[in-house]
Amino acid sequence: MNSNSTIGRTTLGESDTISLSFSEPSSSLNSRSTDVVFASTSTLVPQQGSLTSLPPVSSTATPTYYSTSLTYDETLHTSIDVSSTSTLVSSTDSSSSSEQDTYSSQYDPATSSYSIITPSMSIFSSTSPMSSSSSITSEWSSLTSTTPTLSSSATSLSSSWSSLSSPSSLLVSSSLSLSLSSSYSDTKLFSFDSRSSIFSPSTPTVISPSYTYLSSISATSFQISTTSELSSSWFSTISSPSTISNKDTTFPSSSRNTSTSFYSSSLSSTNDFSTISKSSKLSPSASSSTVSISTISVPTSSSVSSSSSKVPSNRPSSSSSSDDTTSAYSSTYTFQSLQSTTSSSIPPTTQTPSTSTISTSPIPTSSQVFNTVAISSSEDSKTIYYFYTQTYDITDSSTTFVTGLPTTIAVAKSEVTSFSAPSSTITADMSFYQHWLDGSLDNNKNQGTSKTNTGTIVGSVVGSVGGILICVLVVWFMLVRKRKAKRHFKENDSFCHEIGRRTGFPTTAQAKEASLQAQDSGSQQRNTETASANNPFSNEFNFKARGNPPPVPPPRNVTAMNGSFQNMRSNFMDQENRFSYGSSFTYSSLGSSTQGGFSTLSSNSIRLGRGLDNDISHDERNTVQNNSQGFLREII
């Protein structure tokens, strides 16, 4: 339906106010958030090395997943406000229902002020013979797209979800241009975005109507696809002794647990804004006018973000689990704005402000950290066994990761009242982890302990036996040496042995022979008597064989005995000087007094024995000396 109407009106001195608003700030707000929670409580029993005989412990795992929650909020807003106040001289209004308006006005000379305000430019102000005020703020458009929040707790094997939304909007509006006429001459230079506009009227200028179309097209597409795959893998070996057959029964079971999650999202938004002015006609009367085109383009903005998350595999000895999570996110946002204005005179050039704000929270990279330690226990009559997961930081030259290894501690009941697992992280190298995977870690410890115990036992036994033998040898050597020294002292250092050694007849051997001969037969006794005739010490210990003491000699005259004393002295010194008591006889008895050799200290003379008295002949004296024991035996 089209209808045209024309109104002609000429009014002098009437004030008219025209106001136009057009708003176009563009803003986009995108927010994405993801919550992924994995809560697992696991109690494991190590099944390797020396720990295979420990009682089994149950294992419980409870995973909880919260999927991505995406929210998009986009708002497009643009405003332009033009206000002009002037005195109308004549006006013609032509209007149609197809949103085409035409105004033609003629104004008397006045003072006009132009003010152009844009969010991205400064304020430019000038004064001319015409009075007009314009500010920019017009029409707004809002587009809000919100995607649903997806929250799921998945324990199934596979799940997927996808959504595609593509909203679009088309906005067509009209703009208004003013036709002014002035009788003054003015020249101005404006610079907007490196473009210039020059207006140099010298005579009144009439501008025909101009037609302006504003179109806005917004297209948005959004797609989310999520794929989750979950499987489980556990490997355990339980050994239980059988009391009937005395054999161990092994129950193996295995499964695999693999969790793979892939999140992808794609957002594509294209906004085209264009303002086109055409059918601009100038009717000057001897004037020059320069028309410039001012184009402001907002460049295309694109934002792509992606993230990937992967949880390393943790493999204990009694159970193995592989938990891999891969997340990818991509977002593309495209915004394009184009405004083209063709005008004559001094156009109110507008620049479309565009603001794009993207707030993205991608799926974070997650890793399992064993902060909560689950402890289980088992006990027998004397010992309590505690099972918990110890956190290890495995480091190498090329990689570093944190894992939990099941650990068992045996504590006596009498030594512990409560137990708490250590929360610290132990740092170990890759060889430790490799030995733990091979199951040789506990075996090496047990072998080293058994070897150490065996060496200690053998060393203690050998040392004890050797020490006892050495002590016995030392004691035996000391006793034998002491006995030999004592025997040697008795035989060689006795008084009789010394006397016999001086006379040339050792008494030790003779005394032994005498003791043996006393126990032998009569023939041996005869041999002993024969030997005793040659050895004066043969009958030394036979006290019965001693003779009677000699008789006491009568007192003698000293003068009569002087001559005989001298003869006896000479004979005695010649024959008997070889005996040990000769010196005693010579110096003590014979030389002690001038009275014939008799001591004046005693009233009786010394008896020398048979054969030594003066009244005995020389032959008898020799015979008696051979049969008697001598003076030394008398003293002993």
From Swiss-Prot:
Induction: During G2 phase of cell cycle. Promoter is bound by the FKH2 transcription factor. It comes from the Eukaryota. One of its GO terms (cellular component) is vacuolar membrane. Residues 1-18, 510-541 have a biased composition (Polar residues). The modification Phosphoserine is found at S628. Residues 1-33, 87-109, 246-271, 299-326, 339-362, 510-551 are annotated as: Disordered. It is a single-pass membrane protein. The chain crosses the membrane at residues 457-477. Belongs to the TDA7 family. This is Topoisomerase I damage affected protein 7. It comes from Saccharomyces cerevisiae (strain ATCC 204508 / S288c) (Baker's yeast). The gene is TDA7.
